[in-house]
C-alpha cells in the first residue's frame, strides 16, 4: 500500500534589493514564487502583496543602500524542513544570490519562517526563524495574507499573534517603515484555494 505524504503548512519570506541577470527586484520575486511552486512536494497556496522597506543592516537601517521589495508566501510542503530549506537555497543560487556579506545586499533572499509550528534548533536549521518576530518586513506581509496567523515562540512557551508582533516591531523601530508597492499579484490559483492579497491593505 502506498503511504500518502503528509503536507504541513509553511511560511516563506522573500526579499530582493538588487537587480540581477534574471530581472529587476519585482521580477526576481515573481520568479522565486514560480520556482517554489514548481518544487516537487511543495504547492503555493497564497502570496501577499509586495511591500517596499529600507535595507536593514547589522547596525540598523542603511538609507544609502537600495531598498528591498518583500513578500510572504504560504505553501504546503510534503518535504522535511531541511529538504525545503536546501531547495530554497538552490532557488537563491539559480537566481544569482551570492553569499558574501552577512546582512548584505542581495538579488534574492528566501527565508523559511515557520514549518507547521515545529520548533527545531540544529546547526542546519532553526525553526521558527529566530528573528522573524522582530522583522516588520516579514510580519506586515504575513499579517496581510493571513490575518489570524500566530508565530510559535522559539523558547517553547507558546505562540504570539503576528498582528501583535507587528505592532511591537513598529513601535521599537519606526524607521523600518513598510510601504505598499503597486504591482500585479505574485500568485493566483483560481479554483484551487489560492488567494492573492491586496497590497493596499499592508500597513
What spans do the regions from the language model cover?
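Flexible, gly/pro- and Lys/Arg-enriched active-site loops
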Residues: 56-67, 79, 83-203
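Nucleotide and nucleotide-moiety/phosphate-recognizing core
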Residues: 2-12, 18-107, 116-117
